[in-house]
């Protein structure tokens, strides 16, 4: 397997759509390898600030010597509470990248890859108590079948779900390769089917729909009026999650969606299916915190 260094996606598009005030406060809710934070700091003035967060405890933050940067480990579903505890209010923008990094995928012990063996874990946030194997032990056939179907699984979803549950529950030792084989069965499009299945399983392991709904629901309380929330998705399920979350959110409107340039797709394979959703806060949410001037 060729190891590919992770490269943040649509960096310039994020800056162009997020940065409205060079002295503003911006939150990178999924720091990863720091591409978006680095670009934002490069465009901010001396009074600007970037708060970088990531739920992955193994992440090491750059820019620690930059007085305009602050960092911490937190899941973006906890964004509102994290900032409240830090007495930070009135952000000009938030960006969240919903895809896993290549660094995480290539770490076999995380179990995120269907190309080499690893434990059936898939937790991006290690503070989550239950790995995927534990979740599958108590997941019903109908639930897994529905998740596979929602993620565009191209095979017989119920049969694949049944094989996955059987091998996880009955085998004495099971790896991610066994799960990939169970998902694909005898189908000749195995690689694509395994990718779809692993997206569904990763979403389940990390409660991704619930995390996104929490982010969208609480973002208006964090943002200033007119502030932006940018969300990067990488498949049709992610796009549907964003749109469904917006329907139930107060004071957020979708301004536009932005696709990567062909040049970026050609040079950064991770951008191929990406889409940037640009949301703007309007009005005053009932749960909004009072605006504070940062010291």
Swiss-Prot record:
The record lists S-adenosyl-L-methionine as bound by 34-36, 54, 76, 97, 104
GO CC terms in record: cytoplasm
Q: Which UniProt keywords apply?
A: Cytoplasm, Methyltransferase, rRNA processing, S-adenosyl-L-methionine, Transferase
**Listed Pfam families:** Methyltransf_5 (PF01795)
Biological process, per Gene Ontology: rRNA base methylation
Where would you find this protein in the cell?
Answer: Cytoplasm
Top class in the EC scheme: transferase
Q: Which family does it belong to?
A: Belongs to the methyltransferase superfamily. RsmH family.
Q: What does this protein do?
A: Specifically methylates the N4 position of cytidine in position 1402 (C1402) of 16S rRNA.
Name this polypeptide is given: Ribosomal RNA small subunit methyltransferase H
């Amino acid at each position: 397997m060729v190891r590919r260094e992770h490269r943040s996606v649509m960096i310039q598009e994020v800056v162009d759509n997020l940065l409205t005030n060079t002295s503003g406060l911006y939150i990178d809710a999924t720091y990863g390898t720091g591409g978006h934070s680095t670009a934002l700091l490069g465009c901010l003035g001396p009074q600007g600030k970037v708060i970088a967060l990531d739920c992955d405890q193994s992440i090491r933050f750059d820019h620690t010597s930059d007085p305009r940067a602050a960092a911490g480990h937190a899941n973006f579903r906890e964004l509102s509470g994290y900032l409240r505890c830090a007495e930070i209010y009135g952000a000009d923008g938030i960006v969240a990248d919903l895809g896993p990094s290549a660094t995480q995928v290539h770490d076999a012990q995380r179990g995120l890859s269907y190309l080499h063996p690893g434990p059936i874990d898939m937790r991006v946030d290690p503070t989550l108590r239950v790995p995927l194997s534990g979740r599958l032990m108590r997941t019903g056939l109908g639930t897994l079948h529905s998740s596979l179907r929602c993620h565009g699984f191209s095979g017989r979803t119920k049969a694949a779900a049944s094989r996955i549950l059987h091998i996880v529950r009955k085998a004495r030792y099971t790896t991610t390769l066994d799960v990939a084989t169970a998902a694909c069965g005898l189908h000749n499009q195995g690689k694509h089917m395994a990718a779809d299945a692993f997206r569904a399983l990763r979403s389940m392991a990390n409660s991704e729909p619930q995390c996104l709904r929490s982010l969208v629901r609480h973002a208006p309380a964090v943002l200033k009026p007119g502030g932006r929330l940018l969300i990067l998705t990488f498949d049709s399920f992610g796009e549907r999650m964003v749109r469904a979350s917006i329907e139930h959110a107060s004071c957020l409107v979708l301004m536009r969606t932005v696709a990567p340039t062909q040049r970026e797709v050609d040079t950064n394979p991770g951008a191929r299916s990406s889409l940037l959703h640009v949301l703007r806060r309007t009005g005053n949410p009932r749960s909004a915190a009072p605006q504070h001037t940062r010291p």
